[in-house]
């Protein structure tokens, strides 16, 4: 179905940003990131969501690490050697830039109208009414 393909494309685009956000909150290993992503996306659409798998996440983590956005350090969890990820300074700058862009989007009347229409939700109607007066 076209709608499923479009939704998958949208979630794939957000996955990198969400991974950075998750890592910004705590040093976390790949499996922990997968669990957080499952929690994040399943709350959006539990009946349509397929669990995150390692074949999707670890290539993203390797790419982010290779480009210097995150760094991995080996540690032990449950008697297993695991790699814990954290943001580098470059990663923190990138995430801050994403936050700034996101703040700009959600404060844009056109984007806000789009989000409200697509979600049947009046997210900031009171705030927007106050800004207009």
Feature locations, PLM:
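Intrinsically disordered, low-complexity serine/threonine- and proline-rich regulatory segments
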Residues: 1-13, 98-108
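Beta-hairpin "wing" of winged helix-turn-helix
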Residues: 65-81, 86
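Basic, amphipathic "hinge/linker" alpha-helix immediately C-terminal to the N-terminal HTH DNA-binding motif
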Residues: 81-99
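Short, hydrophobic-biased segments on the C-terminal half of alpha helices
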Residues: 58-65
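Amphipathic alpha-helical dimerization/coiled-coil segments
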Residues: 93-133
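N-terminal helix-turn-helix DNA-binding core of bacterial DNA-binding proteins
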Residues: 8-56
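Short, contiguous hydrophobic alpha-helices characteristic of membrane insertion segments
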Residues: 8-9, 61, 116-120
């Amino acid at each position: 179905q076209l709608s499923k393909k479009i939704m998958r494309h949208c979630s794939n685009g957000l996955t990198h940003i969400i991974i950075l956000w998750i890592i910004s909150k705590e040093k976390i290993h790949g499996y922990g990131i997968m669990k957080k992503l499952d929690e994040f996306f399943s709350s959006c659409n539990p009946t349509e969501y397929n669990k995150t798998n390692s074949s999707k996440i670890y290539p993203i983590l390797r790419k982010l690490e290779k480009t210097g956005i995150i760094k991995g350090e080996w540690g032990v969890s449950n008697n297993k050697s695991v790699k814990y990820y954290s943001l580098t300074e470059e990663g923190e700058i990138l995430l801050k830039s994403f936050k700034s862009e996101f703040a700009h989007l959600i404060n844009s009347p056109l984007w806000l109208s789009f989000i409200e229409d697509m979600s049947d939700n009046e997210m900031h109607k009171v705030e927007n009414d106050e800004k207009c007066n």
